[in-house]
C-alpha cells in the first residue's frame, strides 16, 4: 500500500509544482503578503493550479504509455512500468482535477476561467501543439503568464500590464533556452532532429538570437516600468529599484551562456530553484525593493 501511494504521488510530479510559485508574484508586488486572507487565497490558488497540472500530467502519461515504455528513462514512470494500472490513472486524474476545479470555483469566477484556459492550452500543448515550431515556446510563455494572471485574480488586485508584458518576453526567452540546450545536446549525440518537436540542430543559432533578444527586451520593459512616473509615486525611494535591472540582465545572460555550454538540462525555472547564484541574485533584488519601499 505504501509503495502504491508513493507511485501515485510520483505520477503527479510534485517537483513540477515549483513553477506555480509565480502565482504568489501579484501578492508580493501588491504588498498584501502580511494579509492573512490574501495569503490563504494565494495558497489555495497555488494548490488548484498544482493539482490541475498533476491531473494533466497523469492524462499525458496515460496517452504516451506505449512510447514511454520504449524510452530509456521514461519507461520507469509508474504507468509505463506497470506499477500503476490505466484504470487507477483514470480514476486518479478525475479525482485530482475535480478537486482542483472545485478549489478554483470556490475562490472566484475569474480565477476559475483562467484555470480552465490554462488547462485547455496545457492539454493542447501536450497532445499536439508542442510539435509546432515556435508556437510551442509561445504557448509555454503564455502558460507561465497565466499563472501570474491567476494569482492576480486570486487575491483580487489590479492586473499590471507591465508585469504581463515583462512575463511574456522573459518566459519566451526561457522557453527558448530549453530548446537551445536540447539542440546543443542533440548535436553532441550526432543527431539532427528533436524527436516530436520539429526542430533541427540547424535552428540553434536563430533560436539563440531570438531567445536572447526576447530576454533583453524583458529587461527593457522592466527599465521602462521603473522609469514610469506612476511607479515612482508608489515608492518612497524608487531609485533603488534600478538594482533590479542589472540583476535580471546578468541572470538572463548567465542562463544563456549555460544553455550554449549544454549545462541547462532542465526547465530554467526549476533550474533557478536549485541554483545558488539565482538565490543570491534574488536576494540582491529583494534588497533593492526593500530600500525602495
Where are these regions (language model features)?
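Topogenic membrane-insertion module of multi-pass membrane proteins
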Residues: 1-69, 82-92
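C-terminal membrane-associated helical module and adjoining short loops/tails
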Residues: 2-9, 127, 145-293
Amino acid at each position: 500500500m505504501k509503495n502504491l501511494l508513493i507511485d501515485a504521488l510520483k505520477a503527479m510530479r510534485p517537483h513540477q509544482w515549483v513553477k506555480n510559485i509565480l502565482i504568489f508574484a501579484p501578492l508580493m508586488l501588491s504588498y498584501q503578503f502580511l494579509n492573512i486572507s490574501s495569503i490563504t487565497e494565494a495558497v489555495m490558488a497555488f494548490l488548484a493550479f498544482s493539482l490541475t497540472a498533476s491531473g494533466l500530467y497523469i492524462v499525458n502519461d496515460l496517452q504516451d504509455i506505449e512510447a514511454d515504455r520504449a524510452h530509456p528513462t521514461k519507461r520507469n514512470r509508474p504507468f509505463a512500468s506497470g506499477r500503476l494500472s490505466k484504470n487507477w490513472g483514470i480514476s486518479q486524474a478525475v479525482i485530482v482535477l475535480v478537486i482542483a476545479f472545485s478549489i478554483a470555483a470556490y475562490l472566484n469566477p475569474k480565477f476559475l476561467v483562467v484555470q480552465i484556459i490554462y488547462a485547455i492550452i496545457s492539454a493542447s500543448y501536450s497532445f499536439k501543439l508542442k510539435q509546432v515550431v515556435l508556437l510551442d515556446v509561445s504557448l509555454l510563455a503564455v502558460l507561465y503568464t497565466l499563472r501570474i494572471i491567476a494569482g492576480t485574480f486570486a487575491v483580487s488586485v489590479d492586473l499590471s500590464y507591465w508585469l504581463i508584458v515583462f512575463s511574456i518576453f522573459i518566459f519566451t526567452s526561457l522557453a527558448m533556452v530549453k530548446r537551445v540546450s536540447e539542440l546543443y545536446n542533440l548535436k553532441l549525440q550526432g543527431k539532427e532532429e528533436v524527436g516530436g518537436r520539429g526542430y533541427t540542430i540547424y535552428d540553434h543559432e536563430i533560436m539563440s538570437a531570438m531567445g536572447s533578444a526576447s530576454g533583453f527586451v524583458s529587461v527593457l520593459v522592466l527599465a521602462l516600468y521603473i522609469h514610469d512616473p506612476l511607479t515612482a509615486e508608489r515608492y518612497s525611494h524608487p531609485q533603488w529599484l534600478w538594482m533590479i535591472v542589472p540583476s535580471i540582465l546578468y541572470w538572463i545572460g548567465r542562463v544563456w551562456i549555460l544553455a550554449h555550454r549544454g549545462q541547462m538540462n532542465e526547465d530554467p525555472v526549476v533550474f533557478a530553484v536549485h541554483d545558488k547564484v539565482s538565490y543570491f541574485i534574488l536576494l540582491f533584488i529583494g534588497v533593492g525593493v526593500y530600500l525602495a519601499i
